[in-house]
């Protein structure tokens, strides 16, 4: 009898696992930018662009976190920046926002080439 109860309990837990996983999957969007800088760009200019990216959560409510300290970068890129948006709508609304325009003042003049990835569940 105990074996039947244990088997039923385990079966119930296994059946509920996918539903629990779906409920805890975040709806946020991770926006990853890999970048190379224009020739002649100074370390101070690069740091200003990275620092500007880190300030974005305080300037745009739809951005919750920014990571700008690259540990490993491949493919000829110099840096990577990751921004976490609350959801896809926040990412779309960021385009053309005052926060983006302000950051672009320090970022775009020194950006050589960039690649962007937007990732969500």
Where do the language-model regions lie?
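Surface-exposed, polar helix/loop patches in the mature regions of secreted/periplasmic/lumenal proteins
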Residues: 81-121
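Positively charged n-region of N-terminal signal peptides that target proteins for export
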Residues: 1-4
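Residues in and immediately flanking transmembrane alpha helices
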Residues: 15-16, 100
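Short S/T/G/P-rich N-terminal loop/turn motif that feeds into the first structured element of a domain
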Residues: 6, 16-79, 86-93, 119-121
